[in-house]
């Protein structure tokens, strides 16, 4: 089996964080590797190098056109695993907002099968199914009360009747609406041109920490925070921390999204590169302040690049809630450390439109596993792709 090695050097600030987060990731005591918070934030003296690895387990595909209870399966944009081993997946189909219960047969030997067990229609506060074109559901996470937190990134249209705002709301596992979380005004679709959020670039990811804290992040930069990423320049994204009891926003943090990676850099000036896109497609909690971010880039004619990034809200990370713009502002962003990059193809798989990440089961040897899933866009040229890795300690 192939090994993707991650090298962690204590002589660099962000790498010191990576060692701390990876210690949690593989189930070690974080104190075994971590330095005091102040030391991590202020360039500690070089220390011995540590490493962990991701061991490739396998892949499984569900073809586009697969039907379940007479409805086409696809558009999977979020995934989370329940304590009983069942997975909940959210579809971004705007005509019929729905989620699925899945069973994923995964062990150290391979990713053997994915079984669709249940389809659940999402319902509004009135108890009726969410109407068509009122939600673009992109992320899903289980909360301690057994409910499912779902994020919709909203949609802007010049036709007011076709507009729908982004939201973060809680639902039961039977699809009933429980409550809505509050969003800062700047995250609304105001005019899609001069201020507010960008259509199809708003809430794409959710994370719930082991202690129950809730986070959501935008896929692309808010208009007031500057342009979106290009092959030549990166951008600033905002991550919201919510008070889980009230559902109100409690803080915001800045995440640095780098320039769009080009699988073939020699074509940087080509027409296809000018149509490239990059965004934060999901977020998985590792601890109370550490996350794995999924960055997904697409360049027409070249393919998809996916990066897994370890990121952390440190003691010196700025709460940017008071800042009307991140463009030219003074603040300390979240730390970031590249964990894994999948460019176009890997392990015999052509990398598809990866939009979801979840913890898999703890394997027989005690190691944790990770699962990534792609959104097939209901396209015959794509599939719903499940990819799995084992997190291996030194």
Role assignments for model-derived ranges:
Residues 15-29:
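Bacterial N-terminal signal peptides
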Residues 2-3, 28, 279:
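Intrinsic disorder/low-complexity signature
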Residues 33-394:
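Sequence/structural signature of beta-propeller domains
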